[in-house]
């Protein structure tokens, strides 16, 4: 997560909210904000670095990467997954692609990467979800300014799972 934060308490008066509303309805008191020069792939790199602190995985272990984002690097080309492929020094044989989804992206992405890995007999894959909403959100919009921040996650799927995915139910 980016280190910079914006307090939702600081926006209470602007949007006519109470402290109780912020705590109990919004559910969090601050949103993370990326640095102006940070791109989506930079947030993914940080998530990867955090993952490596707890799991012994190297770039050479990775067979595939999916990046789920609605806010890709730059203007969208090359795809964020291709940029991330280079930044992480992944093998040339590593398959990478993006999925453009928002809130439902993690569930769909997990279903896609699970199926993709099974079909191609891959042993290790990474699912990144990353969205720097500060690139597109209107900070004067009460409905989104206090809800959407910037961040990235990564989920490691390998042949030694701690948890297993069951059947996915959509709808």
Name each region found by the language model.
Residues 64-71:
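Short glycine-rich or small-residue beta-strand-to-loop segments that form or flank ligand, phosphate
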Residues 68, 100, 125-131, 157:
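Short beta-strand segments
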Residues 118-152:
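Flexible, glycine-rich active-site loops centered on histidine and acidic residues
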Residues 1-37, 141-171:
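Condensing-enzyme catalytic core mediating Claisen C-C bond formation in acyl metabolism
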Residues 47-63:
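Phosphate/pyrophosphate-binding loops at sites that engage ATP/ADP/AMP, CoA/4′-phosphopantetheine
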Residues 23-25, 29-41, 71-124:
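Conserved catalytic cysteine-centered active-site region
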Residues 20, 63, 123:
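Conserved acidic residues
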